[in-house]
Amino acid sequence: YIKELSHVRGNVPDYRNSFDVAFILLICLIFCYNTYKKWVRLEDLIMLKDWNKVEQPTAEEVDKRLANAKNSLLQQQIAMKEKKLPVIVLLEGWGAAGKGSVLGKLIKNIDPRFFKVAVMDEPTEEEKRKPFLYRHFVKIPEAGKFVFMDSGWMSEVTSQKLSGELSEEEYKKRIESIKRFERQLTDNGYLLLKFFFNIDKKEQKKRLKKLVEDKNTAWRVSKHDRWQNKHYDECMEVYDQFLCDTNHSTAPWYIVDAKDKKWAQLQILETIVQGIDTAFANSALSVPLLQNAFPLKPISRLDEVSLDKSLTDEEYERLLDLYQKRLKELHNELYRKKIPVIIAYEGWDAAGKGGNIKRITEALDPRGYEVHPIASPEPHEKSRHYLWRFWNRLPKTGHVAIFDRTWYGRVMVERLEGFCSKNDWQRAYVEINEFEKELSDWGAIIVKFWVQIDKDTQLARFKERENTPEKRWKITDEDWRNREKWDSYEEAVNEMLEKTNTSYAPWHILESNDKKYARIKALKTVIEAIEKYEAK
């Protein structure tokens, strides 16, 4: 730089001259800025623009390493089943980069009972009426199995951004959703491996031309593929940004040199093998607990709730008729405006949840709602992320889903009965807040009820059920066992209410010693929530 300055000034710089010193400092600042930019890009692992290919081995070396990797994967499948490791392999990349052909070769190395392939084309009309992450979450595998995703959330988001469907603000929300989604998977023991098949513009054009010229493969070339090649640089910018935004240590992106398909297969196969080995080694580690990032509202503890509220029969009948008529009107508006509603019920056994739900559904068009009674998870549900079975039951836009028991079982019964680890249920408060935020951002109205009674009222209702033949089926040994743990459950419920009472999904406590009062309050609360949403 001093030599350059000498050339510009025509003489040797005088370090006592303030102008010379300033000039040298300016050049140093420019140098530091350029170095910083390069450092930031390396730190962020932007891999398309600044991507350096790994030198491709010889054909003999590729064949040898492929054989070793295939043998390793064969042995790992048995251990995966034993250790209950679920693996998601996401394949993204340029059109005609070879994802399909490489995928076909990859799955030949895996027992067909242990994997599924999910081809993520354009969202169906049904999927468009569900939250963005719905169609991706429901595809996750059972413990001990693979899911190979031919495209996924990257293709969906980048396509929408390139077409102008997503504003910059909407794009940022999608990125936050994806980061939460991926973190929840890896925190809950999933191995997530993300690959981007990279080829240059010239190579893509050559492959597309070859496909089009063969009548048996011409159908594989879409309008989007042609558009992508024509706007290669623009696509590169968007893909590059997405890779940067969603690259993190627990689920990094791997850029695959896809010019040679056998070499691409080796890169992926070796990465899968290494990833599984690492997951086995780290399986005993606890996941750090995150701080809640969503503002919480204060809420009363259960022992502070007054349970002496009641209604006369005349008041009850009058208000029931009034509120059910209003809810019926609102249900029509919800369908017309395509607003989804999620009503979640938790509460003590015999608190009156069933009768409460019945009074709400009496006001709804049966074609526009569904009630989901939630019991212990089935084996195929238990072997997936605990929220999976609730993602599967979400309503379409314009419809109502009512949950009799919910995802809050994670921090109540699963916590107290030891069905999950302490780290699992402590982490669940943030995960549930994130889940409900996803639903709220989608546009759902969320109403959560805790149905509260006192211990004496529960005992009286238990005895009534035992002594009434048509109600005897409602009382089980498990109800009596849970009653013995009343104090422990009350402590867990208070913590649940405190840590998940957000502005977008608040809790409402229904004082249900008098069932009539609780039913009317529930109807009124649902109506107010819908009217408040419509007024925004």
Protein language model features and the residues they cover:
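Glycine-rich phosphate-binding loop of ATP-dependent small-molecule kinases
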Residues: I30-Y33, K37-K536
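Extreme N-terminal basic, low-complexity initiation segments
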Residues: Y1-Y15
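Low-complexity, intrinsically disordered tandem-repeat tracts enriched in small/polar residues
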Residues: V12-Y15, L25, K297, L307
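N-terminal compositionally biased, intrinsically disordered segments and leader/signal-like regions
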Residues: K3, F23-L25, Y36
